[in-house]
Amino acid sequence: MNGDNSVESGGAYSAGLLSQVNDSEKMVNNTRLETTDKTNIVTSGENAVGVLACSSPGESRTCVDAVDDEVSDSNSYEVISRADLKMNGGSITTNGINSYGAYANGKKAYINLDYVALETVADGSYAVAIRQGNIDIKNSSITTTGTKAPIAKIYNGGELFFPMSPRYQNKIKEYQLMHQISILKPK
């Protein structure tokens, strides 16, 4: 997507931008969605997602299923295809209850946000959600204003990459130990 763009979605479980792949184990079917200029995304439905990358999240799961505590989500085949979503500039705003600003769902789901203002404003909404996938955030701002609306929910082996100031490194290490998650600095 080139140029200044505006994306709005208003339904439950909707996604502003979606990069999705479902593997067959027989051939690589990578998907890639990239914005090169300012793109503004607004979602207003419950359980909606601003940007979603999904790569075979499990045979019993769909791409829009919530990040939950279910462990048995494996595939009977090797996941070989990637779902990539890269956003350069702009904003993501979610207004619906239990929504995610950016969601990487599946072992080969990758989201890269650079110069993006990410904001969730409803109760139970997470700025970032990861289930086995990877999200890399650089030069961006993250805000959550709803009740029970943490910055990130990461489950089942996901990774979040973002630059950290020394001031927050100890708090993040403590959080990692408490929740057994991986938060890594960019390469």
Listing of model-derived features with the role each one plays in the protein:
Residues 1-48, 52-124, 129-148, 153-172, ...:
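Surface-exposed loop/turn motifs in large extracellular/passenger domains
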